């Protein structure tokens, strides 16, 4: 991949990430938060140590609903949340140690999940470029990358959900299948099934 292409993807990703923060900051200032549903805010599941910090930052939109489950699994293991596949929270747990996680639901788990999700999506964009470049022109591929980045629901890839990791593994499996490297295609396909249930559908495609 040429340096100019990498710079294009990196700059597009940074702009996308910045734009996603704008409505969060605006909403935090202008809209009233109404707590009550147990999976809508990380502050509701916090210990007292970091709760004041979490309350001052617009964090909860990036880790609510499924995100809370993944962080809980990473910090406490499985309880009654067996519907969430293990690869994503398994990655969060060791990375959180880098941020100094020491207690259950420490904010380090949030930042670890956030870093993994966004890093996986950035890597997915690079693999997406490589995969599409097999069949399409540079202009078509870059247009496709922008379409993926600025699709209305692309914010899921920036949240602490497994979508970004799933996309990365799907693209890696597909790319190596196109290159007829069946060992790596199968390896990433296997990891795909550890991320979401529908990952098993990759094998008939391969």
What are these regions, as identified by a protein language model?
Residues 94, 112-135:
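Transmembrane-helix motifs of polytopic, lipid-linked glycan transferases
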Residues 103-111, 128-150:
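Transmembrane-helix signature of polytopic, membrane-embedded enzymes
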Residues 158-165:
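Short acidic/glycine- and proline-prone juxtamembrane loop motifs at membrane-interface regions
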Residues 1-50, 133:
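Start-transfer (signal-anchor) and selected internal transmembrane alpha helices
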Residues 124-132, 169-180, 203-204:
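Transmembrane alpha-helical segments
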Residues 149, 153, 171-175, 183-206:
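Membrane-interface alpha helices of multi-pass inner-membrane proteins
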Residues 61-105:
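Short hydrophobic/aromatic helix or loop-helix immediately within or flanking a transmembrane segment
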Residues 18, 115, 146-150, 157, ...:
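Hydrophobic residues within the alpha-helical transmembrane core of Major Facilitator Superfamily
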């Amino acid at each position: 991949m040429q340096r100019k292409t990498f710079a294009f993807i990196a700059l597009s990703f940074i702009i996308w990430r910045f734009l996603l923060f704008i409505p969060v900051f605006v909403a935090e200032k202008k809209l009233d938060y109404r707590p009550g549903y147990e999976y809508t805010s990380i502050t509701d599941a916090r210990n007292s140590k970091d709760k004041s910090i979490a309350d001052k930052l617009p964090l909860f939109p990036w880790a609510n609903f499924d995100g809370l489950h993944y962080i809980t699994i990473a910090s406490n293991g499985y309880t009654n949340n067996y519907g969430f596949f293990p690869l994503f929270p398994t990655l969060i747990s060791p990375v959180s140690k880098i941020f100094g996680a020491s207690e259950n639901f420490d904010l380090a788990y949030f930042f670890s999940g956030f870093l993994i999700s966004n890093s996986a999506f950035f890597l997915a964009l690079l693999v997406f470029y490589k995969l599409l470049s097999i069949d399409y022109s540079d202009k078509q591929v870059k247009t496709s990358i922008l379409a993926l980045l600025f699709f209305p629901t692309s914010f899921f890839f920036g949240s602490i959900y497994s979508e970004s990791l799933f996309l990365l593994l799907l693209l890696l499996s597909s790319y190596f299948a196109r290159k007829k490297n069946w060992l790596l295609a199968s390896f990433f396909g296997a990891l795909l099934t550890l991320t979401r249930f529908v990952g098993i559908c990759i094998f008939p495609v391969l």
